[in-house]
């Protein structure tokens, strides 16, 4: 028998002995909780359970109601009396004289120690042993079954047990464990109750009363699932309920913005970012997950780096991120109004560095943008790339993409005069007449210098530069047109 079991037995048996020895006048004092030993399970406060929530809870029979309640009316106290070492040996001897397992259960049942306190004492949440190979866990589950049989299922509800076990296992492992309960005599009723509670039978009944998804979320205590929320069948049932609620009431009653707000209020932002990405893999939730990612991106600057980290962790390609952010609909007229596009370009650089792959090279990037934004001309792209040069960490990328366009223009014999007109479309003017700080003018200057260097040599290039520096773009254009 493990040291932990002996410790548990010692505690439980001693508490039972102290209970029997407590004088009548001290009966009330014996009920005081030793806060340094016990950790109470979370229950819903009266302010959380509104009228709709109470109606929601009344929908179910005795077993299913157990799924959505967090009440715990059982005294979870331990006695704080100091142990008398002279009695310890006698207690241990009496307990082990009979069946050790039954003796532990019997002694524990007399102690009024709550199952969660025993769970914490055995450190079951930190155990690395597989669920079905952990004798301490199996013994503890039998204690839970006995505790519920004596005090009622609400004394330690299915949700209490589910979220406690979820701390140490995945949702799939927990599902297998619960199925195995029904093959173990002492756990058969516990397994039946939990399977019924996790079956999702509550969805259709609750929908009839049009209970707000926020109330259902709180009542199901989904925030207790933490980072394992997506693994929980209860969460998937809630998502299905939210979808049906929207279909019945209209999206404006519980839209994606409301769902995002609920997540942000009940979990850390990092967990929200991860959850939104994982929702893309839930049937029927891909578009909603993407929409909430965009909402979060626009409303929280602190979340953007977290989103980059999550995408990298799950190997989300730049092309996929482009779709998630719906950049195909984003205007590309000015850098200062394109926060999402700027961050996407930064993600491209991050992805390259993270994967060590030359994904979306400068040439590929230009073609990708041309394909995804067919209504944008290469002249507009060149101007946008020019404005990107003002973003320090994107300057090199912008120069490379712009240079690729310049190479094509030079190859097709576009001279500076023709380019000056094309860049200004749809305005009835020419780039040379625009202010010097205008991206269109700056793009024309960049191409004129590129053209002159390759067509006219260093001497002519220096002459054109001097004319431009002296605010004489017309003279610079005239000189550049002499290049052969």
UniProtKB/Swiss-Prot annotation:
The keyword Ion transport does not apply. A motif (RxLR-dEER) lies at residues 55-79. It is found in: Secreted; Host cell membrane. Pfam families: PexRD54_WY, RXLR_WY. Effector that enhances P.infestans colonization of Nicotiana benthamiana leaves. It comes from Phytophthora infestans (strain T30-4). The RxLR-dEER motif acts to carry the protein into the host cell cytoplasm through binding to cell surface phosphatidylinositol-3-phosphate. Residues 1-20 form the signal peptide. Its main location: secreted. This is RxLR effector protein PexRD18. Keywords: Host cell membrane, Host membrane, Membrane, Secreted, Signal, Virulence. GO terms for cellular component: extracellular region; host cell plasma membrane; membrane. It comes from the Eukaryota. Induction: Expression is induced during host plant infection. InterPro entries: PexRD54_WY (IPR054463), RXLR_WY (IPR040786). Belongs to the RxLR effector family.
């Amino acid at each position: 028998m493990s040291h932990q079991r002996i410790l548990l037995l010692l505690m439980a048996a001693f508490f039972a002995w102290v209970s029997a020895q407590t004088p009548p006048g001290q009966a009330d004092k014996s009920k005081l909780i030793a806060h340094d030993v016990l950790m109470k399970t979370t229950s819903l406060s009266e302010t959380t359970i509104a009228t709709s929530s109470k109606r929601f809870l009344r929908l179910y029979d005795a077993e299913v109601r157990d799924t959505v309640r967090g009440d715990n009316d059982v005294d979870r106290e331990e006695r704080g009396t100091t142990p008398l070492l002279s009695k310890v040996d006698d207690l241990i001897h009496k307990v082990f004289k009979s069946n050790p397992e039954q003796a532990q259960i019997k002694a524990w049942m007399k102690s009024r120690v709550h199952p969660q306190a025993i769970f914490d004492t055995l450190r079951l949440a930190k155990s690395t042993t597989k669920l079905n190979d952990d004798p301490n866990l199996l013994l503890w589950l039998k204690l839970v079954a006995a505790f519920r049989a004596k005090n009622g299922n609400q004394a330690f509800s299915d949700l209490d047990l589910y979220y406690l076990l979820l701390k140490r296992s995945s949702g799939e492992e927990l599902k297998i464990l619960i199925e195995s309960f029904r093959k173990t005599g002492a756990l058969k009723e516990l397994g039946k109750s939990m399977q019924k509670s996790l079956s999702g039978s509550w969805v259709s009944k609750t929908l009839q009363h049009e209970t707000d998804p926020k109330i259902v979320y709180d009542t199901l205590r989904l925030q207790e699932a933490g980072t394992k929320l997506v693994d929980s069948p209860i969460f998937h049932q809630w998502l299905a309920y939210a979808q049906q609620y929207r279909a019945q009431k209209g999206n404006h009653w519980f839209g994606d913005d409301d769902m995002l707000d609920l997540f942000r209020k009940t979990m850390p932002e990092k967990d929200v970012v991860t959850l939104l990405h994982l929702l893309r893999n839930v049937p029927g939730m891909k578009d909603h997950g993407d929409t909430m990612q965009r909402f979060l991106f626009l409303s929280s600057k602190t979340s953007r780096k977290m989103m980059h980290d999550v995408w990298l962790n799950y190997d989300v390609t730049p092309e996929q991120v482009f779709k998630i952010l719906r950049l195909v609909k984003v205007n590309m007229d000015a850098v200062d109004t394109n926060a999402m596009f700027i961050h996407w370009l930064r993600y491209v650089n991050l992805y390259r560095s993270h994967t060590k792959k030359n994904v979306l090279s400068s040439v590929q990037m230009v073609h990708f943008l041309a394909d995804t934004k067919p209504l944008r001309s290469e002249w507009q792209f060149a101007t946008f790339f020019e404005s990107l040069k003002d973003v320090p960490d994107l300057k090199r990328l912008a120069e490379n993409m712009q240079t690729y366009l310049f190479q094509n223009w030079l190859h097709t014999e576009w001279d500076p005069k023709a380019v000056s007109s094309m860049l200004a479309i749809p305005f009835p003017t020419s780039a040379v007449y625009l202010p010097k700080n205008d991206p269109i003018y700056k793009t024309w200057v960049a191409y004129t210098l590129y053209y002159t260097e390759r067509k006219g040599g260093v001497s002519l290039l220096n002459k054109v530069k001097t004319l431009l520096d002296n605010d004489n773009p017309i003279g610079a254009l005239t000189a550049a047109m002499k290049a052969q």
